[in-house]
């Protein structure tokens, strides 16, 4: 990758730290999936998470809004703070946490209802007051979808193309005004044109939201992110954070040889 391909502004954020992760370990039953993860994730910027398959990238972001707890026999040690609050404190309201931290998955998952009802679903659940028509338009505009669907918001969301469905899922997350948007390989099921639109959308949102994206696409990580985390597994196949820092540094002057080998395609 050339320096010209790093389209995202590499200036560190001035918005502070969104997540502080300290000594985090993650277990599925007795199997340890992640070990000794400590990292700060900056607010109002895009952080990319890269690494070979099976190194715990998706597991890590699922821990950031506690969605991993939906799986059986999961245990998380250590501490994860979101803007200074320990999200695993027993007093934390998980429903409210997930309003603050939206999630977009690999494959588009619109609800089997109208476009309008997809957008208003979250605001209704959380008891938002106000003009729902306005929420729908604002959310769809934020997701760069309004002009394509404004005349058919009362039709089924399942009739949209794959790329449109994924942008609808992003709009649905934005409708509840989250602080953070987690994206787990959001373009893996999309064609190149739809992928480009998602990347352009991420760029427009990065100054408003904290965005954390898992991707196997090195070029995509370079284009959209200001910060990058590289995960790998140790000899016991336990995921670990090898290196993190500004994307430009990770791609062009990594400190760890494993990072350099992965970026250059020598393994992974």
Curated annotation (Swiss-Prot):
Per UniProt, what is one GO molecular function of this protein?
A: ATP hydrolysis activity
Q: Which residues bind ATP?
A: 51-58
Question: Which top EC class is given?
Answer: translocase
UniProt key word Isomerase: no
Where would one find the signal peptide in this protein? none
Domain of life of the organism encoding this protein: Bacteria
Q: Which Pfam families match?
A: ABC_tran (PF00005)
Q: Which SMART domains match?
A: AAA (SM00382)
Which InterPro entries does its entry note? AAA+_ATPase, ABC_transporter-like_ATP-bd, ABC_transporter-like_CS, P-loop_NTPase, PstB-like
Please give the name of this protein: Phosphate import ATP-binding protein PstB 2
